[in-house]
């Protein structure tokens, strides 16, 4: 089987694990040692703003949350005011449960923007970063243009994902920026299946992967 990196993994009704019910998972890594991905449609009851309040900036780190004393909020420039609104809105997005493994660890899937301490290039359009510097930059002008934040990740051992695909537990489709960043969380599973031309009402256990 060819690598499923940069693919979306769509849970089928036949998948027996309730944790992954109607989930869409972005596959970050897939090789002979197994696979690793982030669920992109399983929100937890915490906003990004709430999460950032729990993170202490490193000594000398000047990128933090926007607050009433920020220079951004003091500007009368219309473009700056719009920027502050956009930043505020981005901080109100919900954090996602990326999977059942390492649920205290944060992962940021974002549009391509280098310069972080610990990043992996996933495609021309996407990167994943796990270092603290990007978390502290979220909510500032230094943040990537598009991003989602997850706690935890999903993992498969050698051959495990291949077996689950053969059992028709998953469908696959190439990653779509529209689904990742612009589609409401609750609609991502539906949009991903529609991309394959599948009618949700006719999904059954005898459908193989795409």
From Swiss-Prot:
PANTHER family: UNCHARACTERIZED PROTEIN YQGE, UPF0301 PROTEIN YQGE. This is UPF0301 protein CPS_1252. One of its GO terms (cellular component) is cytosol. InterPro entries: AlgH-like. HAMAP family: UPF0301 (MF_00758). Belongs to the UPF0301 (AlgH) family. Gene3D superfamilies: VC0467-like.
